Design a protein with these regions (language model features):
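Phosphate/dinucleotide-binding and metal-coordinating scaffold of catalytic cores
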Residues: 1-127
């Protein structure tokens, strides 16, 4: 079979990617950027349109808006909001580091994945 949909069987992986997109402010997640590897791992292929200090989130994984974030991850988000790991901070500008902290804090406070209130943050094709 040349193509088969694996979306339903890999929902947790896609939700993890959605949380990552929100945290990193991914500006261009398309369905083609979600690839199922040979051993069943989901890979997110990105091109560097992430970590911007201005809100630019565009993702095809809005399906999970409103889904709760588990308590363990919320505590990790709070820790990240307080201090970004040095190896990541070294790659980002001060403004980008502050924005990651702000997004981590906002996600922890919200406790769920956000909704696209504009209705315009959908790159194509959808997942």
């Amino acid at each position: 079979m040349l193509f088969r949909s694996w979306r339903e069987e890999r929902l947790e992986d896609l939700k993890r990617m959605a949380r990552f997109d929100c945290l990193t402010n991914n500006a261009d997640r398309k369905a083609i950027h979600c690839i199922l590897g040979r051993v069943g791992r989901v890979w997110g292929i990105d091109h560097g349109m992430t970590f911007h200090d201005e809100p630019k989130l565009r993702t095809v994984i809005w399906d999970f808006a409103g889904d709760p974030i588990d308590p363990e991850l919320i505590s990790r988000l709070r820790a990240l909001a307080e201090r970004l790991p040095v190896d990541i901070a070294a790659l980002l500008s001060e403004a980008e580091c502050a924005a990651v902290g702000d997004r981590a804090r906002e996600l922890a406070e919200l406790g769920s994945l956000p909704y696209d209130e504009t209705g315009r943050r959908y790159p194509w094709p959808l997942v």
